[in-house]
């Protein structure tokens, strides 16, 4: 059949392995003109509607926005989203989105004001006057992502293909059953499709541009042919209907005969592909300055009384659109986002339309058939024959069930396009695509965890290396600080080193003691005796020097006179002390004989007088010695010193007399005890005698 089809074609096309021919079910909606869905009461715009991270919010709750105003911003693979209409942001909160998991994502809730007022627009009538980077930035700021289902950021994809693209392919196959959004778009907006192709051709400068469309769309083919009239640089290729001929790798093989290697993209062989809906969005963004805020959505299925295609604003709830198409709820309820083979059942009808939502399928109870239970694999091999990617679905199924992630990866699991052909032909009703999706998610989660661990390890190693460098730097600084010496310090150090060297040269040799023998200490003993002899000699020299000085002092007449004066003073003081002592003794003996109390008083007075006499004698001696030194130097000074000595001696005698009077006055307080008085008197006599001897030892 394929050979008969290609025989009638002027341009050569190829075929791909595998594929199936399910019922098309397209006539329910392809023959009905498109309608414009009115604005709902509330729009729910998810921040992430593409393959990449979500953008940074630029609005807040309670703020008024205009139609086309950016809600988020971003660069690279972060595609911004825009306000589909003018109104107020009532909330920024999580909401369930169109995803198989049914998880909630952050969304902007907008209540339309009914005015639908645009932000300021700046159309580009002649895009050829703009450079390529300006065009790419315009496409990026418009928030355009692939509308065929993948949602890859269009600007990033085009920027990667600025160099080396040979063939530009426009994907108009739309091969999955029930879906007719691209079909109706080409029928009613063929001119915009061709204008968008020219913009891409201006950007990429490919050698050839091909439009691939299946032969089950005669009205769309005719509309494109009319729009291409007189243009020979764009070629329309009609291909036989076969699922999934709309896959990127499969359509590339059909139109060019080239196969994309495992793990690679079509750009690796010089091919870049864009969907028809994406091309129209590019045209409106570049020329009309309209961001991607609406798209064509197919509403079909036997549960709808008026199926068709609608221009729906991004963020419109699914239930609102279903009501526009005459939705009749089924039991059990089933609404599918996407087609019957690649779509998924919605967890809630309150989820919003997003940029990659091309179809909402609401089948009746009997339309999809009864759901039969899953059975064991019988290894029939039908899934292998149907796989358009040349994989081994049976092996991938076992690896996914057994959580053998590396084996699944090595068997090219990520080359699976999840077309559902294997599950369609499986006689055991095994939902193979669900297993593959789950396995891909688990592998991605493990890869992310490994990447985080590697990043943490790299940070730790970098920290350790930094600490080691800082430690080495500190040690180097310490060494440099310790070594830094001034010239004077260096000279001092050198001098000390030289002294130590000389001392070590003159020092005694080290004594070695053989094992088992007693040490010979004779040398040490001799050295010690020599040091003692030297000490005795130095002591004798000092004594001789002192005696010589005394002899010299006596020979000198002036010093002799001073010495004689000192001797007379000492003799006089000794006589006085002796007289005082005798009087004290006599008074004490008389007091003892007469009254014990008086004896105690006398003893106390004697002690005080003896002490004062000794102090006076010491002062007089010091003064005399000082005067002798002065006299030895000068006779006039000697006379002055003698006068000063006489005055000091007189004052000392007066102080002694006062002290004696005080002692006599206090003697009345002595306790009345004969024995204690006798003892005190005896002690006083002894102390007085000792004081006299100390004053005059001669």
Curated annotation (Swiss-Prot):
[4Fe-4S] cluster 1 binds at residues 377, 380, 383, 426. Its EC number is 7.-.-.-. The gene is rnfC. [4Fe-4S] cluster 2 binds at residues 387, 416, 419, 422. Residues 366-397, 407-436 form the 4Fe-4S ferredoxin-type domain. It is found in: Cell inner membrane. It is a peripheral membrane protein. Its main location: membrane. Its cofactor is [4Fe-4S] cluster. This is Ion-translocating oxidoreductase complex subunit C. SUPFAM superfamilies: alpha-helical ferredoxin (SSF46548), Nqo1 FMN-binding domain-like (SSF142019). GO terms for biological process: electron transport chain. Binds 2 [4Fe-4S] clusters per subunit. Keywords: 4Fe-4S, Cell inner membrane, Cell membrane, Electron transport, Iron, Iron-sulfur, Membrane, Metal-binding, Repeat, Translocase, Transport.
